[in-house]
Amino acid sequence: VWLRARSGPVRTRLLDALDGVPLPRRALHPATGDETLFGGIDLGATLAAGRTVRAAGMLAQPALLLLSMAERCPPGLAARLGQALDAPGHCLVALDEGATQDESLPAGLAERLALFVDLDAVAWSDTAPLELDAAELAAARARLPAITCPDDALGALTLAAARMSIVSLRAPMQAAAAARAAAALRGAQTVGEEDLRLAAALVLAHRGTPPPEAEDAPAPPDDAPDESLE
């Protein structure tokens, strides 16, 4: 998830809902190094044991990774997190606190984050507590492998991405996965129109680029002959 929001009660309310994710949380920041991610020698344990003892890194087991100040994520860390996301298991929530649109995630990492949520314009009074029932989530996860996405639905998502000038092939695949998840959450057996609309809003909308404006035809020079007089 790419979560664009300043630190505050609105963002906290959404993050609290992630307690229903059955994965341990791991907090990351832009200065997180390779030893923290992949593990390394535990000096204290090595000295105490008299032999080399290695400590496991954050990526050793599937986890819910929370990357704070994601707009400052350096290219190296972005590449390592992207590699981790390419394998099944980890979930990443990138907390983008950028003040302007120019302050944003590295493109390679943003491409791997399927869902985009922007809370900058959301006031506390417009929110309500998000309560995710653990049993319902477990049932939805159990249904998910059997959820079907018809060919015409996948074609509609691909066509929508093309019309929005989205060149990434990940986008329609991520949108299809989001639509299947939405169908599982509402207890359906196949993807429906409402699931496609939700997937398009969360996965495709922020990636689209407006079509170039048509340029007006140049005006003829003042000394051009008047064709009406010929």
Predicted segments — roles?
Residues 1-120:
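Conserved ASCE/P-loop NTPase catalytic core
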Residues 11, 34, 134-137, 154, ...:
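Alpha-helix initiation and N-capping motif
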Residues 90-164:
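Phosphate-sensing "switch" segment of ASCE/P-loop ATPases
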